[in-house]
């Protein structure tokens, strides 16, 4: 069975088309793998055995009739942030206890319309707030990777830790994820997988639990660049239900793979050489530069002067939007309700019991920066900084730069229940140092594995592109992947 779960989406698609395997066989192989591994890894918070089998059966029937969709019979995991009709959707928060939506998110509806099979809902940081998948109400996810000679558990990154871990451990062929400040790219880098955060507006946000609406964007996590391109094609669409959705044709991203990068101008931002960056990250970056240079790309030094303000500005804008978005969870119409002596007391008791520590922290920060006395000093100033960050990128792209290469994370995956990080949220927030600028500017960014560190843990590089030019990112990421190879964890679970 494990040989079936080892297939990439592209390989499985070809075998299904050739009728060498059936969607039912493939789905059963994944369900068996999940049942055997989930107690150890905790990637899934709900496994939809019956639904998966009936979807696979329907796929086999369509394949037999010659009516196969682009993802026909491909078993996928869905981050618990996406509404799935009649299926557990709780954003891994106690506040949404028992919530089963009566509607389907646009992203998942697009995937099912193309024939994909749902295996279940994936663990994540509560309401997508976190960088280690330790804030989930359902407990932490364990990274399928371990350091050489060690049995210590590592985090898979966050907030899409369940998506990244499930893809790396072959518990799904690919997964949906979301990215507000790095929640696709950082876990992808920590698990040796590929994750792309599309341009803001490329993929519909409708039916996805909102964290920070001006920053949130859905995208795929997959085993390789080709699989990410295949998934992205199905996920992206114009959606009139999302006012930020952009009416642009969705290209065939897979067709961009293998195109030459000769003459492509790749920018290297000097501001990303941060103090205290480990030598192994600098080394990886240089390797990535060399891979692209060897393939014919032109490497240029660039400056993004407002980079150093991105993280503090992000941690004002994102909590501000979150405090507004999360006001709707009050125990009245759905989810958890804790009785109180009157309605105000019920709200208070429900929200106190329903939200975890990190979510409460961010709601309080957000409410504080939006309050009358501090709005101008914090929120307004952060929005002005955001405009300057966006302009930095526009200036660089105006000079002919096609893509920007940076590290994806400042380190490899760190230990589960790390006391230093648990006691210092700012240190945890620094995990997003290379990724938040992309969300602040609404640009596309992809994380691609580029090597292993001295302890045998995966490290990723990030490519940042012009708005709606995801094809360029797939093209350049494919070059790095071809040079660096692919990375799979040794099985311990």
From Swiss-Prot:
It holds the Pfam family Amidase. The active site is at 79 (charge relay system), 159 (charge relay system), 183 (acyl-ester intermediate). GO terms for molecular function: ATP binding; glutaminyl-tRNA synthase (glutamine-hydrolyzing) activity. It comes from the Bacteria. InterPro entries: Amidase (IPR000120), Amidase_CS (IPR020556), Amidase_dom (IPR023631), AS_sf (IPR036928), GatA (IPR004412). It catalyses: L-glutamyl-tRNA(Gln) + L-glutamine + ATP + H2O = L-glutaminyl-tRNA(Gln) + L-glutamate + ADP + phosphate + H(+). Coiled coil: none annotated. The keyword Heme does not apply. Keywords: ATP-binding, Ligase, Nucleotide-binding, Protein biosynthesis. The keyword Signal does not apply. Its EC number is 6.3.5.7. Heterotrimer of A, B and C subunits. Belongs to the amidase family. GatA subfamily. Allows the formation of correctly charged Gln-tRNA(Gln) through the transamidation of misacylated Glu-tRNA(Gln) in organisms which lack glutaminyl-tRNA synthetase. The reaction takes place in the presence of glutamine and ATP through an activated gamma-phospho-Glu-tRNA(Gln). This is Glutamyl-tRNA(Gln) amidotransferase subunit A. The gene is gatA.
């Amino acid at each position: 069975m494990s040989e079936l779960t080892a297939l990439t989406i592209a390989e499985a698609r070809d075998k299904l088309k050739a009728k060498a395997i059936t969607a039912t066989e493939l789905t059963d192989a994944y369900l068996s793998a999940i049942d055997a591994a989930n107690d150890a890894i905790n990637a899934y918070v709900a496994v939809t055995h019956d639904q998966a089998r009936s979807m696979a059966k329907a796929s086999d029937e369509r394949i037999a009739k010659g009516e196969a969709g682009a993802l026909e019979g491909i078993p996928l995991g869905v981050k618990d942030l996406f509404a799935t009709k009649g299926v557990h959707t709780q954003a891994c928060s106690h506040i949404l206890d028992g919530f089963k939506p009566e509607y389907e998110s646009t992203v998942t509806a697009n995937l099912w319309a193309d024939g994909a099979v749902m295996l279940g809902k994936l663990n994540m940081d509560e309401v997508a707030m976190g960088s280690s998948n330790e804030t989930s109400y359902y407990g932490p996810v364990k990274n399928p990777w371990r350091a050489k000679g060690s049995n210590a558990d590592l985090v898979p990154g966050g907030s899409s830790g369940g998506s990244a871990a499930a893809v790396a451990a072959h518990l799904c062929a690919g997964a949906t994820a979301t990215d507000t400040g790095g929640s696709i790219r950082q876990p992808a880098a920590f698990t040796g997988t590929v994750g792309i955060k599309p341009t803001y507006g490329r993929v519909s946000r409708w039916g996805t639990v909102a964290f920070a609406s001006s920053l949130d964007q859905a995208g795929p996590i997959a085993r390789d660049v080709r699989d990410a391109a295949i998934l992205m094609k199905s996920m992206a669409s114009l959606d009139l239900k999302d006012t930020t959705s952009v009416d642009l044709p969705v290209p065939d991203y897979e067709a961009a793979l293998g195109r030459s990068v000769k003459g492509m101008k790749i920018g290297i931002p000097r501001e990303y050489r941060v103090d205290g960056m480990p030598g192994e990250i600098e080394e990886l970056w240089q390797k990535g530069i060399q891979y692209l240079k060897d393939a014919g790309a032109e490497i240029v030094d660039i400056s993004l002067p407002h980079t150093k303000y991105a993280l503090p500005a992000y941690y004002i804008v994102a909590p501000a939007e979150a405090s507004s978005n999360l006001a709707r969870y009050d125990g009245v119409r759905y989810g958890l309700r804790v009785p109180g002596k009157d309605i105000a007391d019920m709200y208070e008791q429900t929200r106190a019991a329903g939200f975890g520590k990190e979510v409460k922290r961010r709601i309080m920060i957000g409410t504080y920066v939006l309050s009358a006395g501090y709005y101008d000093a914090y929120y307004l100033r952060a929005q002005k900084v955001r405009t300057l960050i966006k302009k930095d990128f526009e200036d660089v792209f105006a000079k002919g730069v096609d893509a920007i290469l940076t590290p994806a994370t400042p380190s490899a995956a760190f230990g589960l229940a790390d006391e230093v990080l648990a006691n210092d949220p700012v240190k945890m927030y620094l995990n997003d140092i290379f990724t938040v600028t992309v969300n602040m500017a609404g640009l596309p960014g992809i994380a691609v594995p580029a090597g292993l560190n001295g302890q045998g843990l995966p490290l990723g590089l990030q490519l940042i592109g012009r708005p709606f030019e995801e094809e360029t990112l797939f093209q350049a990421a494919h070059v790095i992947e071809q040079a660096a190879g692919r990375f799979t964890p040794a099985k311990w679970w």
